[in-house]
Amino acid sequence: MFAESPIKRRKSTRINVGNVPIGDGAPIAVQSMTNTRTTDVAATVDQINRIVAVGGEIVRVSVPTMEAAEAFKEIKKQVSVPLVADIHFDYRIALKVAEYGVDCLRINPGNIGNMERVRSVVDCAKDKNIPIRIGVNGGSLEKDLQEKYGEPTPEALVESAMRHVDILDKLNFDQFKVSVKASDVFLAVGAYRLLAQKIDQPLHLGITEAGGQRAGAVKSAVGLGMLLAEGIGDTVRVSLAADPVEEIKVGFDILKSLRIRSRGINFIACPSCSRQEFDVIGTVNALEQRLEDILTPMDVSIIGCVVNGPGEAEVSDLGLTGARNMSGLYEDGKRVKERLPNDDLVDKLEAKIRAKAARLSEQNKIQVSVKD
């Protein structure tokens, strides 16, 4: 029920990764990357489908060998989400996956061989309308840049990126996006800020090798949040040493917290204290697990007492305020007569939330129809 995000996004050009528009005001896309062996087609397809099930809009797949390229061909046939092929060094792999219908090539033109090889890949991308992602990483900077700067710096990452950008510019190719990732938040943020001033192309955001599920989520939220709050970024990936499904969940949570994109339920819940009249933590955890399938954006407040409960409920689509034995229920910011028994909250609140989500979804369909 809060107003739209006050963030003014950086202007950028538009590319399309399959059917997903990137840049020029398009919704910020959330993507992930498989961590299976690409040659294990069944496992890779299964993981891609699980990523898509929680909202993944683009999936990157590593294609290190020709054998993996042949597996990619079969994977592409079995999924509908746009796929990005991650390729290093061998330009022939890029040509092969282009033949097999790849939606985007993640390559660095400067490391796939001489200019003729680069030209062959770019000409193929032009012919098949395939965008390219230039991906610079603080852990793999060119040796001369390491010597020049002594260590990875924002300037070093951007100089590396601009080398690849210049190659594409010389070949009259502008359908690309760029990332300048690092595992250090300040290094990555500084590099993206510099790059945003130098080019108009879309920027793919990420804090690379961020860490395990908890620490990586925090680091990504801080780094990506800083950039997104400044209007920088057109697509995001949260890199976690965890199930890629978790990357999508965290990515959408970051966008949701900045009111950039809303997907699913935004739970507003107190950390609980001795004033709580029901088990707030247990209730919220249970509902989060049960309601992961709901995609309709909505705010649900679950507060254990009457100190902050009514205030939060008044700005929520549904709100629960703790009271002795029977807790108060709010809908659209207004108190309703019905009260819910504290000893049976989860089942009843789940039913209320699902019903509200269905009504909101129907209202959204009607509004879109009227606009059309």
Curated annotation (Swiss-Prot):
GO biological process, one term: terpenoid biosynthetic process
Key words of the record: 4Fe-4S, Iron, Iron-sulfur, Isoprene biosynthesis, Metal-binding, Oxidoreductase
Catalytic activities: (2E)-4-hydroxy-3-methylbut-2-enyl diphosphate + oxidized [flavodoxin] + H2O + 2 H(+) = 2-C-methyl-D-erythritol 2,4-cyclic diphosphate + reduced [flavodoxin]
Residue numbers binding [4Fe-4S] cluster: C270, C273, C305, E312
Keyword Metal-binding: yes
Transmembrane portions of the chain: none
Entry's EC annotation: 1.17.7.3
Protein name, entry field: 4-hydroxy-3-methylbut-2-en-1-yl diphosphate synthase (flavodoxin)
Origin species: Alteromonas mediterranea (strain DSM 17117 / CIP 110805 / LMG 28347 / Deep ecotype)
